[in-house]
Regions:
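Ampiphathic alpha-helical segments that act as solvent-exposed interaction surfaces
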Residues: 25, 73-85, 122-134
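Generic "edge-of-domain/loop-turn" microfeature
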Residues: 13-15, 63, 95, 112
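Amphipathic protein-protein interaction modules
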Residues: 61-107
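Short C-terminal domain-edge/linker segments immediately following a structured domain
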Residues: 38, 85-90, 118-122
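Residues in well-ordered beta-strands of folded domains
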Residues: 7, 57, 89
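Short, extreme N-terminal segment that most often corresponds to the first beta-strand
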Residues: 1-29
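Acidic, proline/glycine-rich low-complexity IDRs
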Residues: 96-134
């Protein structure tokens, strides 16, 4: 089973926005929109209280290309709009290396950091019992 939760607050830059023209900031947001539209994924782009954010929820029996597309889309948006920040939480019990843990993808200042979660992981016994005696 695969479980993915993602949220990315989109901001054009982490630097002083006053040093950018409105046109250049709007161009960044147009690029972000194109990235999302061409991703081939079921991402949700929303605006709330003057803030743009991107969310992803995926539950699947097996990992598919959509999982990788979501992660790559978040990376592309983060590199384009460098003020963006957010997180993807991923659990894939068929991943030979990370089968018993959540993986975290942290996005900030145009970078993506991949870590292993230590709150819910190891999934067995932290959030589930070992019902098969593995």
């Amino acid at each position: 089973m695969l479980e993915l939760h993602g949220c990315l607050t989109i901001s054009e830059t982490y630097k002083d926005e006053d040093k950018y023209t409105n046109e250049s900031l709007e161009n960044i947001m147009r690029q972000v929109t194109r990235i999302i539209e061409s991703s081939g994924t079921q991402l949700t782009l929303r605006y709330m209280n003057g803030t743009t954010f991107l969310t992803a929820q995926l539950y699947a029996n097996h990992r598919t290309k959509e999982t990788d597309n979501i992660i790559e889309t978040y990376k592309s948006v983060s590199k384009t709009a460098t003020g963006s920040y957010g997180i993807i939480y991923l659990r894939d019990d068929e991943d030979t290396r990370h089968y018993n843990e959540f993986q975290i993808f942290i996005f900030k200042k145009g970078e993506c950091i991949h870590k292993t979660d230590d709150i819910f992981s190891p999934c067995i016994p932290t959030i589930e019992d070992d019902i098969y005696g593995l």
